Amino acid sequence: MKVLFVASECAPFVKTGGLADVIGAVPKALAPLGVEARVMLPLYPALRVLSEGGKTVWSSDNLHGGAARLLDVRAEGLDLLLLDAPHLFDRGGNIYLDADGTDWPDNPLRFGALSWVAADIAANGAAGWQPEIVHAHDWQAGLVPAYLHQMDAPKPPCVLTIHNIAFQGLFSPDLMAPLGLDAALYTQDGMEFYGNLGFLKAGLAFADKITTVSPTYAREIMQPEFGMGLEGLLRARARDVSGILNGIDTDVWNPETDPALPKSYSLKGLKAKQQSRQAVLERFGLTPPDNAPLFCVISRLTTQKGVDVLLDVVPDLVARGAGLAVLGSGDRDLEAAFVAAAHRFPGAVGVIIGYDEDLSHLMQGGSDAILIPSRFEPCGLTQLYGLRYGTIPVVARTGGLADTIIDANEAALAATCATGVQFAPVTPDALSHAIDRCCDLFAERKTWSGMMRCAMRHPVGWETSSKAYLEVYDRLLGG
């Protein structure tokens, strides 16, 4: 089976969030199941080195104002189709934002181009390769199903995966014609969204199947609280919607082989985790006592992630003698508030604004628990990394967090299957209580050790989820 993945980012080449990790991992997980996958993404400056020796399999003299070509490249175990359109993608800043943190004004043309080329390849093939399934991801590839829908030629079915419904790609309807979209598609049942052209809505309206990244999130987004205005469309298409949990790349995230850790460790020998703990303490300038847990946060600093609620309970956490290491960036006000907390509680709270992949690995290896107080979380990956490294997740009971973490209640502790601490609602009182529970569990060393071992045994790879994706593909092909 041949499958074309279409996305705006892919690890390890270019990454701004969990989407990249998924796109970098799923094709590899599907390969043993007989799926021949290729990943189409833009050729950003960071990927330019990959283009050397790439084979041109498609070209155009004018793709939204400039020449473009599609390069067939193999790198890091992935078959890539890189859209080389320098006028659209060869620029500094973030892949979505300029140096000032503002959306590139031509983002609809940039990702509309990606979607159009993907649809063209889906319908017509390239260099003898043509997909049987197209799998588009998030709003950046949301127009792929729409372009396929308006084609008269035979074309493969399309799956759209929602990684975060909060990001919808809303633009002026004046772009319909420049994007080559049929005006008849701009309806309430199509891609119109409160007077805007909705890229994600277009995908939801015209994809043959819709998936999202956890069963709980699939149910949540059909309700007004989480659906961001798209809940009605999703309820109407409920039979076509399924939730498939994300996994992680267990080769990349492996405490037995992770080069970012000062010393590897495993279920057979957890003592070496203490060396990573000491390294984290030194990096963040922390001095909590050995009998108190070291909490970490590795997150975008936004209200969606609930870190504003965490700020309210930092004094309670410090009063318990615990330490807190924070790595992340996001809203400037929240960044400043965390830096202020570090100044207020020296030795107890350490903050590094930004993102560092190696440091995130070290923090997973060296922390005792990871705090994830998200108001909503489609799936979440950091809690899965925590499980893999025996770093106990303390999570809000929502989305994929609810699906992947077994709360340390009396029944779960008695059955020796607890892997973390859940709490709800996302309020300072509930989070403070969850932190208290975690500290109490940490004090019971035998109980804590058992939770660590349960966490590390918990399956977090792609084996089950890749089979679920294959089932979706098979159903579309009549299998």
UniProtKB/Swiss-Prot annotation:
Residue numbers binding ADP-alpha-D-glucose: 15
Catalytic activity, EC: 2.4.1.21
Isomerase listed as a keyword: no
A GO molecular-function descriptor: alpha-1,4-glucan glucosyltransferase (UDP-glucose donor) activity
Keyword terms of this UniProt record: Glycogen biosynthesis, Glycosyltransferase, Transferase
Pathway involvement of the protein, from the record: Glycan biosynthesis; glycogen biosynthesis
Domain of life per record: Bacteria
UniProt cross-references to InterPro entries, sorted A to Z: Glyco_trans_1, GS/SS, Starch_synth_cat_dom
One annotated Gene Ontology cellular component of this protein: cytosol
Reactions mediated catalytically: [(1->4)-alpha-D-glucosyl](n) + ADP-alpha-D-glucose = [(1->4)-alpha-D-glucosyl](n+1) + ADP + H(+)
BP-aspect Gene Ontology terms: glycogen biosynthetic process
NCBIfam families: glgA, PRK00654.1-2
Family: Belongs to the glycosyltransferase 1 family. Bacterial/plant glycogen synthase subfamily.
Role this protein plays: Synthesizes alpha-1,4-glucan chains using ADP-glucose.
Record's protein name: Glycogen synthase
Organism: Roseobacter denitrificans (strain ATCC 33942 / OCh 114)
